[in-house]
């Protein structure tokens, strides 16, 4: 399975109906880059929820930042969500069993607190 990655830019959404139709016809995942589209909508649905995965960056130069690098991925696909949960923590299914090579992709504590505070204020 391959992917297509539309990039929503400056709060303007891509033509997601067309993109999703093409992806469906060719058995592709749609991974949205919604970093510049916090709270932007396409046909009354939020950007980042229109494809298989939505990606948001917390980098200092993006619309929503947490004083350092970080990000979040959204999905309504349970299989992809389970895969992401696995790879976000070294591929571990428990303390002693690693089933896939992966990284530690969690925010540090300070960034998580800042992100939570900012989300309560702005979103």
Predicted segments — roles?
Residues 2, 26-27, 63, 102:
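Generic secretory/membrane-interface signal
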Residues 37-43, 50-121:
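Active-site region of PLP-dependent enzymes
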Residues 1-5, 121-123:
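Conserved small/polar residues in nucleotide/adenosyl-binding loops
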Residues 3-5, 10-44, 77:
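Catalytic PLP-binding core of fold-type I/II PLP enzymes
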